[in-house]
């Protein structure tokens, strides 16, 4: 093993409470839906690609509107997460410090562009990671982005740590 590639949600932090509130605010402001998103709902959806999440949450809307709404949810989510860092998992920085001594660290997640950067900025953990990718950056799903990280950084024996 020469490197570790982490997912973000459910692995490094739990942003679901903050995101749920931001998404619910968008839904109530911009739709006629009486839908309230909670952390449990998001835990069941995170890990999927955003268009898939949009089709679940906004099934009654045309595809174009689904994508617009999920984009708005993500914009509000970024603002909320920049204002308040989501809870990090216990001893995360200490663990990353220890891992960084022997392994190269990366992040790959099925999220929108900017989300990983928000995590790195608000958590202050950016110095531990050499690189990161997501579908919002590449248009590719997690598996393809993991392969891209492996190729770009010439990793020989990486492991992936995540819940999906």
Please identify what each model-predicted range represents.
Residues 104-106, 131, 159-161:
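A structural signal for isolated positions on well-ordered beta-strands in alpha/beta enzyme cores
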Residues 79-107, 117, 143-144:
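Short, acidic loop-to-helix structural element flanking the phosphoryl-transfer center
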Residues 2-93:
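N-terminal helical cap/lid subdomain that shapes the substrate entry/recognition surface
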Residues 3, 142-164:
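Conserved Lys-Pro-Asp/Glu-containing loop-to-beta segment of HAD-superfamily phosphomonoesterases
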Residues 41-42, 125-140:
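A short, structured active-site edge motif that brings together acidic residues
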Residues 11, 109-111:
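Conserved phosphate-coupling serine/threonine residues in phosphotransfer and NTP-handling enzymes
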Residues 23, 54, 92, 116-120, ...:
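Hydrophobic packing residues within well-ordered alpha-helices of enzyme cores
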